[in-house]
């Protein structure tokens, strides 16, 4: 384990369970992002801090992997650690252990820091915080998307409604996974939970605007792409477990 890390304990909320009682992959991303924000706040980097420094943190891409998908009501421990900014990207790894101390999930998130005044990516933050960063974080997940350019199937159109948007006024990063699962044929998601996901965020979809979503089988899973005003908004690759069809009683 790297020397600088932050630990947060959670209970999987009922509202974050799917039809089988398992935690939705989008919920994992929300819990992970909350732990990252709490980590920063514990070192004095709150909303006011970022406003005063004229910067914003955005997620560029992220991946998650489940060894076992937890059920609603389970008590979990999230351990998150961040690597020093390299070429404008901050790697943050979050691991999840269950009540028995077994690691059941990992998330690899790549954050970017943007100057609000000049609207460009900063290669290094204009401050230092002792005890927050690690020189390196060894663990990582594959971030490949296994893109498909042909034979894409149109799933439909999604509106960035109130329930999908966050304080920034556009679709929340985690909810793109819900959209991706909604876009796929129901038989696919019924067969088993998501065990791996890689997602890239290209352009935001503002509140009230629409996005077309397309999908295609790819490698061992499914490739999805969302387009807003003719430009790519997000791309995603999902893999599902085959056979974990039992429900939590």
What residue spans do the PLM features occupy?
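HotDog/MaoC-like acyl-thioester-processing domains
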Residues: 3-8, 63-146, 205-207, 216-249
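Hot-dog-fold acyl-thioester-processing enzymes
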Residues: 1-59, 106, 114-195
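Acidic/His-leaning functional-site neighborhoods
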Residues: 158-238, 246
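Short coil-to-beta-strand transition motifs
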Residues: 74-75, 150-154, 209-210
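Short, positively charged
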Residues: 47-48, 55, 73-76, 92-94, ...
């Amino acid at each position: 384990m790297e020397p600088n890390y932050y630990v947060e304990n959670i209970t999987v909320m009922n509202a974050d369970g799917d039809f089988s009682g398992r935690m939705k992959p989008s919920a994992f991303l929300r819990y992970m992002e909350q732990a990252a924000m709490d980590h920063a706040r514990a070192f004095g980097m709150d909303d006011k801090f970022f406003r005063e420094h004229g910067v914003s943190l955005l997620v560029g891409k992220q991946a998650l992997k489940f060894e076992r998908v937890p059920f609603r009501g389970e008590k979990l421990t999230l351990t998150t650690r961040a690597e020093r900014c390299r070429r404008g990207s901050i790697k943050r790894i979050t691991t999840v252990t269950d009540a028995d101390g077994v690691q059941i999930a990992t998330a690899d998130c790549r954050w970017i820091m943007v100057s609000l005044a000049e609207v460009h990516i900063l290669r290094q933050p204009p401050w230092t915080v002792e005890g927050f960063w690690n020189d390196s974080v060894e663990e990582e997940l594959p971030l490949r998307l296994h893109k498909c350019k042909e034979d894409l199937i149109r799933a439909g159109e999604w509106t960035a409604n109130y329930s999908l948007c966050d304080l920034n006024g556009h679709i929340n990063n985690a909810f793109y996974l819900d959209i991706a699962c909604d876009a796929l044929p129901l038989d696919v998601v019924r067969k088993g939970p998501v065990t791996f996901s890689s997602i890239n965020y290209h352009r935001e979809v503002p509140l009230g605007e629409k996005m077309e979503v397309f999908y295609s089988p790819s490698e061992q899973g499914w490739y999805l792409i969302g387009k807003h005003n003719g430009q790519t908004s997000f791309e995603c690759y999902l893999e599902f477990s085959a056979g974990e069809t039992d429900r939590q009683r």
